[in-house]
Regions:
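Acidic/His metal-coordination segments adjacent to aromatic residues that form catalytic metal sites
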Residues: 34-54, 114-140, 157, 190-194, ...
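Alpha-helical scaffold segments that form or flank carboxylate-/histidine-based iron centers
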Residues: 45-56, 74-93, 136, 161-173, ...
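Glycine- and acidic-residue-rich phosphate-binding/metal-coordinating active-site segment common to enzymes
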Residues: 157-208
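Extended, helix-rich structural scaffolds rather than catalytic motifs
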Residues: 196-327
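Conserved alpha-helical segments that form or flank metal/cofactor-binding pockets of metalloenzymes
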Residues: 20-24, 81, 86-114, 180-185
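Helix-loop segments that flank and shape redox-cofactor active sites
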Residues: 40-45, 63-85, 147-162
Length: 327
């Protein structure tokens, strides 16, 4: 009887049932019950997740480029093997996340094409060049360190497939962060030229790493709704503060300095206070006018076009396999 009533309400666009569904959804959110693909969800919730998961997936895929650029120039065979494994992990993370996005009813090819067309974004950090080997260590340490702060909270996001993907991704990102810090430690204990190279990399990546958490909460158009639906668990400013508190002691342990003259430790609050982020630079990069924006998208478009035959072959093989099973 209930199923028949639900069907009638759906066919007649019965508003009462819609309210009941929304109330049930909000109740599940309040009770910390994961929302699964087969569950009813508001269209705005679905669209918000597609945007966030899609951008997260794009970031993993585009993030392979600045590091992949150094695979052939790694200083030792050990470093090369580590970097190869890391870039391979990033590709896997992108695939997990595209699969999670597909559970929301979107097509992987569609959201990927939107990224290539500039209609979907990826993390601003990957629009900065990697100029030295120290940059690779600093990306692992600072950039993946910032990602971990963000992503550990996402292990408890309200959408089940996203949360489960994040559990695996966070384990691998922790390895990446430790690998990056170990590479930076080796440079910090090396020659004066190596130490200067490390400090230069920190100087260039410190502020972009802070920008990874997004705009201040007051200026973030999506944060309030994402927090209410528990897609996000913490605001951008709180996560950014956690990263600074975690990372400044690590910088000092390496004998390096944070490129922020306003940085100080506040005894009363127990937090580090840091200077104002250059939000104009953030806006420029996020809107496609960064140092490497054009280069990154050009590389991805080239790979997409040259890889068309692989996708076609895989599809043809899948169709043959399906036909055999049906027969």
């Amino acid at each position: 009887v209930i199923q028949h009533y639900a069907l009638i309400c759906k066919l007649t666009n019965h508003k009462g049932d819609d309210v009941t569904q929304e109330q049930r959804f909000e109740q599940r959110i309040a009770q910390e019950t994961a929302i699964e693909p087969q569950d009813w969800m508001p269209d705005a919730y679905r669209k918000t997740l597609i945007r966030q998961i899609g951008q997260h997936a794009h970031s993993e895929i585009v993030g392979m480029l600045p590091e992949g650029n150094w695979i052939t120039r790694a200083p030792t065979l050990r470093r090369k093997a580590i970097l190869l494994a890391k870039v391979q992990d990033e590709a896997g993370h992108g695939l997990y996340l595209y699969s999670a996005a597909e559970t929301l009813g979107c097509a992987r090819e569609d959201i990927y094409q939107k990224m290539l067309d500039g209609r979907m974004k990826y993390s601003s950090i990957f629009n900065y060049p990697t100029l030295s080997w120290a940059d690779i260590g600093v990306i692992g340490w600072l950039v993946d360190g910032a990602a971990i702060v963000n992503q550990v909270a996402l292990c408890r996001t309200s959408y089940g497939p996203y949360a489960r993907a994040m559990v695996k991704i966070c384990k691998e990102e922790s390895f990446h962060q430790r690998q990056g810090f170990e590479a930076c430690m080796a440079l910090a204990q090396g020659s004066e030229a190596q130490r200067q190279m490390l400090q230069d990399a920190i100087n260039r990546f410190w502020w972009p790493a802070l920008m990874m958490f997004g705009p201040n909460d007051d200026n973030s158009p999506n944060s309030a709704r994402s927090l209410a639906w528990k897609i996000k668990r913490f605001g951008n400013d709180e996560l950014r503060q956690r990263f600074v508190d975690n990372t400044v002691p690590q910088v000092e342990m390496l004998g390096m300095t944070v490129p922020d003259p306003d940085l100080r430790f506040d005894e009363e609050s127990g937090h580090y206070r840091f200077g104002e982020i250059d939000w104009q630079e953030f806006d420029e990069v996020i809107n496609g006018r960064g140092i490497c924006n054009h280069e990154r998208l050009a590389a991805k478009r080239k790979a997409w076009e040259e890889g068309a035959w692989v996708r076609e072959a895989a599809l043809a093989h899948a169709e043959k396999q399906h036909a055999r099973k049906v027969a």
